[in-house]
Amino acid sequence: NMYQAYRSMYEAFGIKNINAILPPPQQPIPMDPSLEHILAISGKPFQAYPGQDHKAHIDAHLSFMSISMVQNNPMAMMGLQKNILEHISLMAQEQVQIEFMEEMKELQMLQQQLAPMMQNPMMMQQNPMAMQGQQRVQQITTAIEARKAVLIAEMTMDYAKEEDKISSEVGG
């Protein structure tokens, strides 16, 4: 991260008001699929964001990928495919958050309770309640990650089928 490297250097030199010399980088903003298509054919980066209509973005990108101009542009295809995978990951994460809402609340509560004990591993080992809490955290985390992996696999298979359809329509 170049910004952070320069910022650290300026801090080490004792420079005041670093933001006047080195403005913070602009945060990227979510955009609609057509703006992402423009960036894709221009070879510029774009990314998926939480809360977007991921299915709509994926559908729009798949349709756009069927256009010969896009298919003949490997960088655009790569950018669109990368973005679709980002949307799949976020869609799975958001689905897991809905499905595991109660478990996530429990997980947060357990982590808050265990945080002070995590500073002292000996205290953790000597406290059976802390060990049970740690096991429960692991259990919840494993269940969430397993479900997320299943969702990603299913969504990726759906994406692959749609991409195959596009390839066969263009090729045939």
Residue ranges, per PLM feature:
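C-terminal anchoring/interaction modules
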Residues: 1-172
